[in-house]
């Protein structure tokens, strides 16, 4: 986590769709990039289900059906895959619920479920303010507040510290409640506390952590329950413990539990005053507990002022949800302020990146021409942009002259026989791509819809432009992220070479020029920026030359973005090998760089890569078809199709694919038999895939190949071939 002074809060100020009313007592969960909110309220209890797409910055109201639950507040809300469970909560003043509902988010279908009661004892009583946590196939219910009175208008509160376990059925439905026999001292009764479950990487013993809450007075105690031994304990912690609080949020990212907001004691209270009599206020304090070392770290203190409104203002009863390494916060009540008979609630949506993004996958080639590359890389969740860099063996003049002048190429060489490395091809395509169709990438409609069996690849292309060169604050990327959709079951990526295929091409001669004035020469190991891109695709035809005396262009600090308008551009050269790497950027800065990929610009006269690859199953195996290159550069003499196969060599170097030719001829289709597929290599680096390559040959020889990753479902698709 970044140092407190480096926290880069982002307020989402631009969004579309029906924005939910501000509220408190609601709950939120995440399904991939979607934040799903239910319940809570202010002027009455809300019963709508609201969804926020964190990529498109769009709110929407799904058309739910089935046993739609009544609105509730301070309820339990957990997510298991695309299934959401709701338990308990307040349905109206003084009347609480102990009903359980299940939402299948893939169909937006509600169902009321009736778990079996415990073998001994009673099922949970109606309650609010309890914790409801999921781990594996079980939910864990602890504490809350019940109403002892049968008259909802005569509220007699009773704080609870009972503990239940709810076993779930796989996919849908539940088995029933049980009351585990626990050991050790049980935490005191409470409501509006938080509970999370964490399991260390080297441990098979998950633990539930309960923090804070309310029992007449706010609490600041931390409790731990070992879910294997069912033993309660009170771990000793280091660092400054957050103030006693309730109605706060606790979110786990990695090995850290982040605590934000809630009701806390007023800082001006008399220390001799009983906790029951002192005043309380909302806070915007922000801390985390390292769950491995049991050490608290304060990121924003309760006394820290925010005169610039650069972070969420104090609140309680809000919601927080973790998507990747990013935390989102929405709404909540603003202290004791009232408007008529209602609380004043916050309307704002904020997020905070808790760490730099991981390295993206290697850059992958979609299409190469004589003077450009269309490249992509796997998307990294919750990032604001990508820094793309390249390196070449060619040397260029490094000068600060007019960027429109084309610099001379020194000592230039073009080797038509040199090809890119196969290591750039083993990464799979990410599960989601932008809704703007990308060449050779199959796209389908709704992010939660079940997969169709159609396996066509759409070859229509739309390229994404880099950010403006003089961007000074990367917060502008937040509202520019485009909508994503799930990738279908086949994705095509052109390759840089076909194994065992020789490319016979004459090098295009070009002159060596000697500069009239002494200039610095870029060294081969220096990396130059191509630019900063909002999406995971880029059309590369130029790059920025390093200023004289600089070894690198981009800093790795917070929002350190170079002013590209001051730098000189260099065009790509035909028949030249370029190395690429990419890094993701978020509010914490620029993350680590990816592994290096190599691609070669086309030599004039050779055919382009085949396009619009389609795969369909038939009785003999599969049918593979494609369209001719859009730029054949003469007559196409033949096509070759190749299949990546299993070999002993691949066990030593899995990234080095070995290909077997399965077709050679003039037709733009072929049949791949089940016998050939039995020898196929399955690439498991991301999602299981069988890899094909297809290339075209004209009078000069073979051009670049199109690589096809046929994504496999391990049970459905891989099974018949093995």
Swiss-Prot record:
Q: Which UniProt keywords apply?
A: Cytoplasm, Kelch repeat, Nucleus, Repeat
Q: Name one GO cellular component term.
A: MLL1 complex
Skewed-composition ranges (Polar residues)? 419-436
Q: Where in the cell is it found?
A: Cytoplasm; Nucleus
TM spans, by residue?
none
- Provide the primary localization: cytoplasm
Molecular function GO labels: transcription coregulator activity
InterPro entries cross-referenced by the UniProt entry: FN3_dom, FN3_sf, HCF1/2, Ig-like_fold, Kelch-typ_b-propeller
Start and end residues of each Fibronectin type-III domain: 359-460, 514-604, 606-716
User: CDD domains from the entry?
Assistant: FN3 (cd00063)
Q: Where are the Kelch repeats?
A: 34-79, 83-130, 207-255, 257-303
Q: Please describe the organ and tissue distribution of this protein's expression.
A: Expressed in the spermatogonia, spermatocytes and ovary.
Region annotation (Disordered) ranges: 398-476
The keyword Metal-binding appears for this protein: no
Question: What Pfam families would the database entry show?
Answer: Kelch_HCF (PF13854)
User: What is its quaternary makeup?
Assistant: Binds KMT2A/MLL1. Component of the MLL1/MLL complex, at least composed of KMT2A/MLL1, ASH2L, RBBP5, DPY30, WDR5, MEN1, HCFC1 and HCFC2. Interacts with TASOR.
Q: Please state what the protein is called.
A: Host cell factor 2
> Which gene is transcribed and translated to give this protein?
Hcfc2
């Amino acid at each position: 986590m970044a140092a407190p002074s480096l926290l880069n809060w982002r307020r989402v100020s631009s969004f579309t769709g029906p924005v939910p009313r501000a509220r408190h007592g609601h709950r939120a969960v995440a399904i991939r990039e979607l934040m799903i909110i239910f319940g809570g309220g202010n002027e009455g209890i809300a019963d709508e289900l609201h969804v926020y797409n964190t990529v498109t910055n769009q709110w929407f109201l799904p058309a739910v059906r089935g046993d739609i639950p009544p609105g509730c507040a301070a309820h339990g809300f957990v997510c298991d895959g695309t299934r959401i469970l709701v338990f308990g909560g307040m349905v109206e003043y003084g009347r609480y619920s102990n009903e359980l509902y299940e939402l299948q988010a893939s169909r937006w279908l509600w169902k009321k479920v009736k778990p079996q009661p415990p073998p001994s004892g009673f099922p949970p009583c109606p309650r609010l303010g309890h914790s409801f946590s999921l781990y594996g196939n079980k939910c864990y219910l602890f504490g809350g507040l019940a109403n002892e009175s049968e008259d909802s208008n005569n509220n007699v509160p009773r704080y609870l510290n009972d503990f239940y376990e709810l076993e779930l059925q796989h996919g849908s439905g539940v088995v029933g409640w049980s009351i585990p026999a626990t050991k050790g001292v049980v935490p005191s009764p409470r409501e509006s506390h938080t509970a999370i479950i964490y399991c260390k990487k080297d441990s098979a013993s998950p633990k539930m952590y309960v923090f804070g809450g309310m029992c007449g007075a706010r609490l600041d105690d931390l409790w731990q329950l070992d879910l294997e031994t069912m033993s309660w304990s009170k771990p000793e912690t280091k660092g400054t413990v957050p103030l006693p609080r309730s109605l706060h949020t606790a979110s786990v990212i990695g090995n850290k539990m982040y605590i934000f907001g809630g009701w806390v004691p007023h800082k001006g209270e008399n220390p001799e005053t009983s906790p029951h009599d002192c005043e309380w206020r909302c806070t915007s304090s922000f801390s985390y507990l390292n769950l491995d070392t049991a050490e608290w770290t304060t990121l924003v203190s309760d006394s820290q002022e925010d005169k610039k409104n650069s972070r969420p203002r104090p609140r309680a009863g809000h919601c927080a949800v973790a998507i990747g390494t990013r935390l989102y916060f929405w709404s909540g009540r603003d202290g004791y302020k009232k408007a008529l008979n209602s609380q004043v609630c916050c309307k704002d949506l904020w997020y905070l990146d808790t760490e730099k993004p991981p390295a993206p996958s290697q850059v992958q080639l979609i299409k190469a021409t004589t003077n450009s590359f269309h490249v992509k890389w796997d998307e990294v969740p919750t990032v604001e942009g990508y820094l793309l860099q390249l390196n070449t063996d060619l040397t260029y003049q490094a000068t600060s002259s007019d960027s429109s002048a084309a610099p001379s190429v020194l000592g230039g060489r073009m080797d038509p026989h040199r090809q890119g490395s196969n290591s750039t091809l083993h990464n799979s395509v990410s599960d989601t791509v932008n809704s703007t169709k990308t060449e050779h990438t199959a796209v389908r409609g709704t992010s939660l819809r079940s997969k169709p069996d159609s396996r066509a690849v759409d070859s229509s292309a739309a390229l994404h432009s880099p950010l403006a060169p003089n961007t000074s604050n990367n917060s502008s990327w937040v509202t520019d992220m485009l909508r994503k959709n799930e990738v279908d079951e086949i994705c095509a990526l052109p390759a840089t070479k076909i194994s065992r295929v020789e490319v016979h091409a004459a090098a295009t001669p070009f002159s060596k020029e000697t500069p009239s004035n002494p200039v610095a020469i870029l060294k081969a190991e220096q990396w130059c920026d191509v630019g900063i891109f909002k999406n995971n695709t880029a059309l590369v035809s130029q790059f920025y030359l390093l200023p004289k005396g600089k070894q690198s262009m981009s800093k790795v600090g917070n929002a350190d973005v170079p002013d590209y308008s001051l730098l000189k551009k260099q065009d790509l050269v035909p028949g030249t090998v370029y190395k690429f790497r990419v890094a993701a950027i978020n509010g914490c800065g620029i993350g680590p760089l990816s592994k290096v990929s190599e691609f070669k610009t086309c030599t004039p006269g050779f055919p382009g890569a085949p396009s619009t690859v389609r795969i369909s199953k038939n009785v003999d195996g599969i049918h593979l078809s494609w369209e001719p290159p859009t730029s054949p550069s003469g007559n196409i003499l033949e096509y070759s199709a190749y299949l990546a196969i299993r070999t002993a060599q691949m066990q030593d170097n899995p990234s080095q694919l070995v290909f077997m030719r399965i077709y050679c001829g003039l037709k733009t289709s072929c049949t791949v038999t089940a016998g050939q597929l039995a020898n196929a290599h399955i690439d498991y680096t991301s999602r299981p895939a069988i890899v094909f390559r297809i290339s075209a040959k004209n009078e000069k020889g073979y051009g670049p190949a199109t690589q096809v990753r046929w994504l496999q479902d391990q049970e459905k698709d891989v099974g018949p071939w093995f």
